[in-house]
Amino acid sequence: MRPQDLTVVRFGYPGSPHNPALAHWLRHLAEQGYDVRDAHFDFRVDLVRNREAGRFIEESDADAILMIDGDMVPLDDTGAVLSAPGPLVFCRHVSQLGKEIEWQNQGIPTGCVRIARRVFERLDEPWFVYETDATIRLVTCCEAATFTKKCVAAGFNPKPAGRIGHLLRMVAMPPGPGHQAPEYDFEWKILHQKGLL
């Protein structure tokens, strides 16, 4: 996708650690001429995603927006999200629990997703919505899942293209007595040895 056809928005969380790998990747995109912006999840994620999608529609002439969360770590094949065909393209990644997101059931992973302008123009606002229980204490459906449902109902089929890492804070330890180690379906990569962090 040509730089003038894509707006890139990095979504940061207050107090998040610096992510040098993502900063380097975004700087490289900016040097190529892509419009790279910052947004902050200073309140509900669905509201911030809607705000930035609205800004994109109102302030940009680009054909698509790439939404990328500040805790994503670009890999060798992450750039596929920039050029893969389709109006709704995303990178596969794991959730904060370390499991790959089953996008057909849970909604597309919005940590790194390219969305064409025409998707927003065809869907009714709000595009991203948390569904909650009656007490508004429990999220019953995240903004990624509700957005995916709307897209599929409007005839847009999400397409995976490439992978992206998810920077997770965690403590690794062996299982306790009488417990078995859990099975995980993701790769480990020591990023500082590759010069990424």
What do the PLM-derived regions correspond to, one by one?
Residues 50-64:
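Active-site nucleotide-sugar/metal-binding loop of Leloir-type enzymes
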Residues 43-48, 140-141:
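A short, glycine-/small-residue-rich helix N-cap motif at loop->alpha-helix starts
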Residues 1-40:
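N-proximal low-complexity "stem/linker" segments adjacent to membrane-targeting elements
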Residues 61-73:
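Short beta-strand-to-loop acidic/aromatic patch adjacent to the donor-nucleotide binding site
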Residues 24-25, 51, 80, 146:
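Alpha-helical elements of Rossmann-like donor-binding domains used by nucleotide-donor carbohydrate transfer enzymes
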Residues 53, 72-135:
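Conserved catalytic core of nucleotide-sugar-dependent glycosyltransferases
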Residues 129-197:
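C-terminal catalytic/acceptor-binding lobe
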Residues 61-62, 85-87, 156:
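Short, high-confidence coil segments that cap the C-terminus of an alpha-helix
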